[in-house]
Amino acid sequence: MAIGIKVKKAPADYDLGASKFFGTPTVPLAWEGDFYEDEIFLCQIKLADIAKFDRENRLPHTGYLYIFLHTDGGDYDLEADVRYFYGEPELAIDDFNLEVEGYEGFNDAYLMEFCEINDGEACTRLLGVPSDWNYEDTPPKLLLQFDPLDSEMGFLDHLDGFLYFFFGKDENDLESVTLVEEYS
């Protein structure tokens, strides 16, 4: 089972604590100043929003999951910074991506809507198995599959394939999540 993600551009007065790609991240106060200069905000997921679809309880059902990207290597060498916070965020960081060269335009928020889908469906989604896995070995466990052509966000729209965020050996260790760019 996988959790599909559909996105729509957020209205001006949206809830900053909503599940979304880009826009203003809302984070714990303790994280203030805890980001690198080359880091951009990709998404935040309010885990209560996905609880009814995560029947295997692979993710927590409270708090927030965040994905930031280190961009020092450019579009073709991104690195994931995946974080979990168990409570409610207290700090909104406006224009998070504005100072990162090449990513200044990714400040508009795109709200996420979740639905249950088949494991291998080719779209932006959580969990399941990676689409287009062309290798003989068993694929790593998937946290997030991002399909740049699945929306009008414009992020990495030159990538004809997927960004995969794979769990490490321990799904509870989000610091071990790896990012793989896969071209079709």
Regions found by a protein language model. Name each.
Residues 1-184:
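Preference for intrinsically disordered or flexible, low-complexity segments
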